[in-house]
Amino acid sequence: MKRTPLFEKHVELGAKMVDFAGWEMPLYYTSIFEEVMAVRKSVGMFDVSHMGEFLVKGPEAVSFIDFLITNDFSSLPDGKAIYSVMCNENGGIIDDLVVYKVSPDEALMVVNAANIEKDFNWIKSHSKNFDVEVSNISDTTALIAFQGPKAQETLQELVEDGLEEIAYYSFRKSIVAGVETLVSRTGYTGEDGFELMLEAKNAPKVWDALMNLLRKIDGRPAGLGARDVCRLEATYLLYGQDMDENTNPFEVGLSWVVKLNKDFVGKEALLKAKEKVERKLVALELSGKRIARKGYEVLKNGERVGEITSGNFSPTLGKSIALALVSKSVKIGDQLGVVFPGGKLVEALVVKKPFYRGSVRREV
């Protein structure tokens, strides 16, 4: 299994390590519950160095990215980032990602760990007609997420630039604990926070400095377990569960990242798909504390209407919550049933998204 540059730090902290997409990653350090609560009330710090980073350079970098992703990259100012998906020719989602516009001839793409090789090969295959150079810098890049309502005031102690000046989905290159770092106001938890991108060799030094800050504010390191709970509470999607190449953006509530007034891979298929959307992703609150798993059937009046894509117990809400891909006829307020192993039917209420709205700054 692969290991991030912070592997030894996780072992020192007594983390429960698990295999995630071929990476040996911390599932939790003390408990998922405590780590979720730290993110919600103070700060949680995540090692997300397993994510993939690609550097795109060249005079046609912006037009190339614009051709790859569904969102509008060309009108983005330097120093801003954008969330998007990449689709195949059939409109299926290859991956969701964040792209940073560094300059008119340089962009940085951050993709999901499980898709690094697939994404890089797909991107390279489309680069031949553009004056660009695409590099996979994943192995030499570390990524640390510092998330929670106290993230700005806490992190500011170590950062030379004023964090208040970094707006949501904006970034700048700065010095953090003496190390050159790209600091972005982005995250996957529903809280305010920052993601720190730096050279892998410098990651342990920065991690240690951040750990010293966390101890002062009752913050804590957080593993993939807490990350998954936080993202589900905030109703952020997970690739491979809530979406994949068999779903299109309109089915999973991502129509807002599809800009049909420009050209991109999969546009023709999405123009057609938009006219006949038969499924949608809905939020469910389940009765009891049992966790609905991916693939569990969802029934309405005894008839199958879809299936669970993600489920977990929410410590923040004290409820079992889930996302389900269901027939478009399902609406908020509907009472559904989720079929658990053994045929047990658990009641589920369709609720408004998101389940939880935290301190995240929504102005982009």
UniProtKB/Swiss-Prot annotation:
MF (Gene Ontology): aminomethyltransferase activity; transaminase activity
Catalytically driven reaction(s): N(6)-[(R)-S(8)-aminomethyldihydrolipoyl]-L-lysyl-[protein] + (6S)-5,6,7,8-tetrahydrofolate = N(6)-[(R)-dihydrolipoyl]-L-lysyl-[protein] + (6R)-5,10-methylene-5,6,7,8-tetrahydrofolate + NH4(+)
UniProt superkingdom: Bacteria
EC number: 2.1.2.10
GO biological process: glycine decarboxylation via glycine cleavage system
GO cellular component, one term: cytosol
Family annotation (InterPro entries): GCS_T (IPR006223), GCS_T_bac (IPR022903), GCST_C (IPR013977), GCV_T_N (IPR006222), GcvT/YgfZ/DmdA (IPR028896), GcvT/YgfZ_C (IPR029043), TrmE/GcvT_dom1 (IPR027266)
Keyword Transmembrane helix appears in the UniProt entry: no
Keywords associated with the record: Aminotransferase, Transferase
Principal EC category: transferase
Oligomer status and interactors: The glycine cleavage system is composed of four proteins: P, T, L and H.
Function description: The glycine cleavage system catalyzes the degradation of glycine.
Family classification: Belongs to the GcvT family.
NCBIfam families: gcvT, PRK00389.1
Name of the protein in question: Aminomethyltransferase
Gene name per UniProt: gcvT
